[in-house]
Amino acid sequence: MKVLEDDPNYNAGRGAVFTHDGTNELDASIMEGTTRKAGSVAGVTRTKNPISLARKVMEDSPHVMLAGRGADQFSAEKGLAQVDPSYFATEERRRQLETLKAKKTSWFDVDRKFGTVGAGAMGAKGHVAAA
């Protein structure tokens, strides 16, 4: 997942889609099938790899989800890489935002429902993990 988050061609991490206000708020979740443990984060703005933070939530906290400033604070406390929010922005995503705003149509198209970037894996012993 970190490879996808670091690649500006994907809409997770660097290259994330902007909010209507022109900011990037990132989400990530992870689940481990054997233990059924899960961790997730929402509205992260400073954590370079939100999937790493979701894993920390799963492994190092009593919570299943953290959001916003509290999630970024937890990330910094756990020593995860922090970046300026501008790190996530790309010219292509900014162009897409401006194109959508110029159309002056509904921001949410009910016919175009897409999820986030995801990955699943099965180990040699049949253990399944998803992120």
Task: Give names to the regions the model predicted.
Residues 1-131:
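Alpha/propeptide regions of enzymes that mature by internal proteolysis
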